[in-house]
């Protein structure tokens, strides 16, 4: 059994404000796969404050910096692909083949799609004597379901990062 009892906030693994845990049950075996920390409103506030502070710098990052980040993310994802699939199998009880081919594959697919769009995206578009500028909006709050965990996270995180937003 593995325990994931910290949150990654402001570049560091931190303890939750209130130490409360939840068991993760593998629905295929009904075995406890691990425990996770449960967040509170205070934890969310800390994460939002950190994301807001990071927004000022990230929103001003260059296209080249964002492309480089996505290239590094994709390379790291490929290195950990088997681990991702194994975690999906364990935490949601998905058959290994489904976790490997569909679940883990969809996550990297969203990163690759965002990178492809980012390389050709026009953040500035002249229209006659006017310039339309598309800018990052701020901190994005991303709520994802459990049934396609990597897919639902990646399809929200990838575009947010690509356009210069931070997220919680």
Predicted segments, located by residue:
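Conserved small-residue-rich beta-alpha loop and adjacent elements
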Residues: 122-168
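Conserved hydrophobic/aromatic pocket- or pore-lining residues that grip, position, or stack substrates
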Residues: 66, 88, 111, 140, ...
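Short linear capping/connector segments at secondary-structure termini
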Residues: 87-95, 102, 125-129
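Long amphipathic alpha-helix in the N-terminal Rossmann-like dinucleotide-binding domain
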Residues: 71-82, 94-120
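Conserved catalytic core of two-component sensor histidine kinases
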Residues: 45, 105, 154
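Secondary-structure boundary/capping residues
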Residues: 60, 82, 86, 97, ...
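Short, structured beta/alpha segment
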Residues: 1-90, 112-113
